[in-house]
A protein has these predicted regions:
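Solvent-exposed soluble domains appended to multi-pass membrane proteins
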Residues: 157-163, 177, 182-488
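N-terminal secretory/membrane-targeting segments
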Residues: 1-169, 190-210, 247-251, 255, ...
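Short, hydrophobic/glycine-enriched beta-strand segments
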Residues: 170-177
């Protein structure tokens, strides 16, 4: 249970039971019955107790006063402690956060269910009650915001005077490719062959570059949020580690770029894994997506094929499901695709894997590190093939389509390279490109200042690539990207 779930009690209590998993009703009934039994037991034991609940013996006025004060303190002090703890446990550096850590709390913000199972439902619940979102600027006011809005309205008019199209005249597909990156860029690592030759060629002929990731080995949803909202994680306080879990559930409305395409039917999400991860199922509804296709539903993704011994749905299958959605309608859409094929761990999943990795330092790779890297390389090469085939199919369509493709972070398998702090930047750079099909009229476009970027800038870059007009907000992102290429 999340704090945001309590909104159902006042807004949608009638449908609350429909959100519970199968069998949950019996679990609740058993818990209520057990609680009632405990209460009855305590009442019975109280009657057997000669003191009748008194902490100190004695029936005089002073003893009664001492008992009353003791009872009051036993109620107030724990209540005060719990209140103060709940208000501060989500803030980095607070006494409550330190206390929780000492007591063994290990936040698992990627999955609220796992977090509750690992740390306890109450701990998982309280950490999301009062997260510190961001520091309020000293000069923040209505007047200041009006000035900012006017400044970027003017900037948007200047940009739009030189552009002729609209983003919503095309279908735009965001592809977050799980852990996709170039192993040949990892310091101290030598690979026997290129795992991404086709994507490398695609990058040479369209807008492309390197993306600075805020994560290494994880943090997918944060990069996803940045791409959809245009907001960087750098905007938030360090206490806010997962917007999907700590911020979005409590927001009445969350502005996301897919909403430019109007009605919810024009926004589709696809992710071949569990819909509960990062609370995506509920968050995507709030973002304005009509469907979010996953393995667990309620909208079930159509293609679920896996490759050899891999436990994850292949990118080829995910692209097939995406193509089906694109072909379903003549209308233009926004599609958010989050792949799973290259998710960790990596244990000799693929047959006929001829990829090899060795160390260029005086320390050879450990067996488990080498196995993971070589398995990952094969997976990346399969992504390379599937992505090229996907774009080829989009090129056959008669309607304009633009694809924003990016790897969210490097896989957390380079233990040798990550041991050296000097390799930090290299281990946080992935590949991205913005590509348009023939029907778009912007195929082959290459915009300036594309060598380095971050997901929050992709929408502004896509607009420039598509020669599309911008809103004041996109004008702001365009101007910021021209001054600061990458913000993690």
């Amino acid at each position: 249970i999340l704090p945001s779930d309590l909104n159902f009690l006042k807004a949608d209590a009638g449908n609350l039971m429909s959100f519970m998993p199968s069998g949950a009703q019996w679990t609740i009934l058993i818990a209520v019955a057990a609680f009632a039994a405990f209460v009855a037991l305590f009442v019975f034991l109280n009657r057997l107790d000669a003191r009748h609940g008194r902490l100190f013996r004695g029936s005089d006025k002073q003893s009664r006063s001492v008992n009353a004060i003791a009872r009051l303190l036993l109620i107030l002090l724990p209540g005060l402690f719990f209140t103060l703890y709940s208000m501060q446990v989500s803030t980095v550096g607070s006494w409550a956060k330190g206390f929780a850590t000492v007591m063994g709390d290990k936040p698992s913000m990627w999955d609220s269910v796992y977090d509750a199972q690992r740390n306890g439902p109450l701990v998982a619940f309280t950490r999301q009650l009062n997260p510190k979102v961001m520091v309020k600027p000293d000069d923040y006011s209505e007047e200041t915001m009006k000035q900012v809005a006017a400044r970027y309205e003017k900037a948007a008019k200047k940009i739009n005077a030189k552009r002729s199209a609209n983003m919503t005249d095309s279908t735009v597909i965001y592809v977050l490719s799980e852990s996709f990156s170039d192993p040949s860029r990892v310091p101290g690592l030598k690979v026997n062959k290129d795992s991404m030759p086709k994507i490398r060629e695609i990058k040479q002929n369209t807008t492309s570059g390197l993306m600075l990731s805020s994560g290494y080995g994880g943090g997918t949803a944060n990069l996803e949020y940045m791409g959809l909202s245009g907001l960087s994680m750098a905007n938030f306080d360090s206490s806010l580690t997962s917007p999907y879990q700590q911020l979005v559930p409590s927001e009445h409305w969350t502005p996301t770029i897919n909403q430019m395409w109007g009605a919810a039917k024009n926004s589709i999400g696809l992710h071949p894994y569990e819909s509960s991860m990062y609370s995506r199922a509920t968050n995507y509804k709030k973002f304005g997506f009509s469907h979010f296709y996953t393995l667990t539903g309620p909208d079930v993704i159509s293609h679920q094929d896996k490759i050899d011994d891999s436990p994850y749905v292949s990118d080829e299958a995910t692209y097939k499901s995406t193509l089906e959605q694109v072909k379903k309608t003549k209308s233009n859409q926004f599609l958010q695709v989050i792949t799973m094929q290259n998710h960790m761990p990596y244990h000799k999943w693929y047959k006929h894997n001829d990829f090899k990795a060795t160390s260029t330092t005086d320390k050879p790779l450990k067996d488990d590190e080498q196995e993971s890297i070589e398995t990952y390389q094969k997976g990346a090469s399969l992504t390379d093939d599937a992505t090229a085939d996907f774009l080829a199919e989009l090129d056959k369509l008669g309607k304009p389509v633009t694809v924003v493709f990016y790897g969210d972070h490097l896989p957390g398998i380079y233990s040798s390279a990550s041991a050296d702090d000097g390799n930090s930047l290299a281990l946080h750079q992935t590949d991205y490109f913005i590509w348009s099909n023939k029907a778009s009229g912007t195929q082959g476009n290459k915009i300036g200042n594309a060598d380095y970027s971050s997901p929050n800038f992709f929408v502004a870059q896509a607009a420039e690539h598509m020669d599309a007009k911008v809103s004041p907000y996109l004008a702001f992102l365009t101007e910021m990207h021209s001054k600061i290429s990458e913000i993690g």
